[in-house]
Amino acid sequence: MAKRNRSQFRIQERTAKKRKHEDSLLEGNVFQNAPEDMDENTIYSAKGSSWDEEEQDYEMVPRKNRSDTSNLVEGLPIKVNGKVERKLHKAQEKPKDDDEEDEDSNDSSEDDEGPNEEQEAEAKEDEPDTEEKILQLKEDIADLVTKVMEEPEENTAALGRLCKMVESKNPNTCKFSMLALVPVFKSIIPGYRIRPLTETEKKEKVSKEVSKLRNFEQALVYNYKNYVGRLQSLSKTPSNAAPIQVSLGILATQAAKELISTASHFNFRTDIFTLLLRRICKPRISTDPTSIQIIQTFETLLNEDEEGSISFEILRIFNKILKTRNFNIEESVLNMLLSLDVLHDYDPNTKLKGNVSAPKLKKKDRVHLSKKQRKARKEMQQIEEEMRNAEQAVSAEERERNQSEILKIVFTIYLNILKNNAKTLIGSVLEGLTKFGNMANFDLLGDFLEVMKELISDTEFDNLSSAEVRKALLCIVSAFSLISNTQYMKVNVDLSKFVDGLYALLPYICLDADIELSYRSLRLADPLNNEIIKPSVNVSTKAELLLKALDHVFFRSKSGTKERATAFTKRLYMCISHTPEKTSIAILKFIDKLMNRYPEISGLYSSEDRIGNGHFIMEADNPSRSNPEAATLWDNALLEKHYCPVVTKGLRSLSSRSKECSK
């Protein structure tokens, strides 16, 4: 009983001391200054409790479990003294991901949220792409392309996202999306130009389908414009830039080439034409792998254009670029003009005949229409005009206008090249003048003839190469082709310079080994030749050009005389001894035709009953100075033993005809 009372007394005493101590702490604000993380042991130590009642530090430390294998990884077991022992080693801790650290930093700083997101996007673009990322990128692009191809009007957002990906700084994203958009645009581009809506059309009420179609057309034009602009910026990459940028520029050029082959009628075709023409209008295009394909694309467009609008647009841009580049381009680029097919049925003389306007009807002969009827007729005419514009139906007058403008630009380009004396392009210019010369305008005739006379005068007839012989022949044929268009006008032009040049060329033509060969001839290409060879559209051989020039001199112009016919016959007989079989036969047929027009040349076959002063000067390059009346065709006796029986037969026929003419 006494023990129980003592224990109760002690408990009460201890409780009283505890309360007193807590009251003193409250009065001294000790709890307010105490740290928040103060545990219960610290509080009891502050009370002054006895050491026996407090828990010691080592009692609070958890016991070590030696068998804890949470951080251990079991390796391969080993066998020691016949016993198998387990081998454990510590597992390597994985470092924290950068993404988690970025998320923590983003959560801590909400104010810098916008700039951090942009930096993260740029950092992601700068990161090298792994195979997994590239595969995922291809799958995403394929999904977007599938959506647009299946329902283009419903998925304009997917089209916009693809166009946005082209502007990415990541080269893989830019490349894959740019190439993927080519078949997309080729399939969804309509067969007509899309014009902007007028203010009246925007305000008027339309059906759901029309509104849906208009929204799709406007979205298509907007995205297509951005895409073409991106192609333009990429294609301007210089060749000394980074290899990745150069490859992107080549891919952009190829994409533009593919687009324009099917979308030449659509909006922004001028931008694509400019992009491609700037790419090939260079002094050396052999370094550009896309140049040959671009030239072939333009040739196809010029050859298939029947209306003339595409050809006119291409030539207008081409002329402008040529002036800025000072005509410093390759010949294969200029040869594109020879593919123009829209001029094949153009006759500039019909314009003069068709300009006669129909006589106006007198007032008494007109059909009387009321004011209401006139208004209705005017509205109907406007509707018909809008329908024609929508259908892009080109009338005969518009086509003829396009042909006239195209021909004007072509001759302007050729004349400027001749005036600037661009030697590498003269051959192509003469090819073009030979093809289009008969359509030349009378105003340009004098300029062309003056330039061509200078070319013939500057030609040194001492030692000419095969290419120089062809250029001189083309110059002569072109000059006569230009004059042939003026037959309906009374124009007298002195062409003696070209006749003398043709006479001087004959010895070099007959000694040319390739006189009957063109680029179509069956010959193996030189494997060591790396140049881009664009054969001319005018595939005439030198023999054909020679016969064409002779025909112009004696049968299509007033340049032929008895004296010139005699001199040319003598020199042509000298050429037959060296020319191949087919050329020799063709020359004999020409002489037979010439004898019908100028029977005086029959005197060359015999020296009987003929009075001649002096002797024939064989070395003279001017027919009037060679004294042709004193010439004799002693070559006939030599050529009678020619290896070709057809040539021998032709010579005998001419000899017998000469005897009939001299009687």
Swiss-Prot record:
Region (Disordered): 1-132
Feature: compositional bias, Acidic residues: 98-130
Stored Pfam families: CBF (PF03914), NOC3p (PF07540)
Entry's Gene Ontology molecular function annotations: chromatin binding
Keyword annotations of the record: Cell cycle, Cell division, Coiled coil, DNA replication, Nucleus, Phosphoprotein, Ribosome biogenesis
Sequence positions bearing Phosphoserine: S395
Subcellular localization, as worded in the UniProt entry: Nucleus, Nucleolus
Residue ranges, compositional bias (Basic and acidic residues): 82-97
Transmembrane segments: none
Domain of life of the source: Eukaryota
Any Gene Ontology CC annotation: Noc2p-Noc3p complex
Biological process according to GO: cell division; DNA replication initiation; pre-replicative complex assembly involved in nuclear cell cycle DNA replication; ribosomal large subunit biogenesis; rRNA processing
Sections of the chain in a coiled coil: 363-408
Quaternary structure, from the entry: Forms a heterodimer with NOC2. This complex may be associated with pre-ribosomal particles. Also interacts with MCM2, MCM5 and ORC1.
The protein's role, per its UniProt record: Required for synthesis of 60S ribosomal subunits and the transport of pre-ribosomes from the nucleoplasm to the cytoplasm. Also required for initiation of DNA replication. May function downstream of the origin recognition complex (ORC complex) in the loading of CDC6 and the minichromosome maintenance complex (MCM complex) onto chromatin during the G1 phase of the cell cycle. Essential for growth.
Family: Belongs to the CBF/MAK21 family.
Miscellaneous comment in the UniProt entry for this protein: Present with 11700 molecules/cell in log phase SD medium.
Protein name: Nucleolar complex-associated protein 3
Source species of the chain: Saccharomyces cerevisiae (strain ATCC 204508 / S288c)
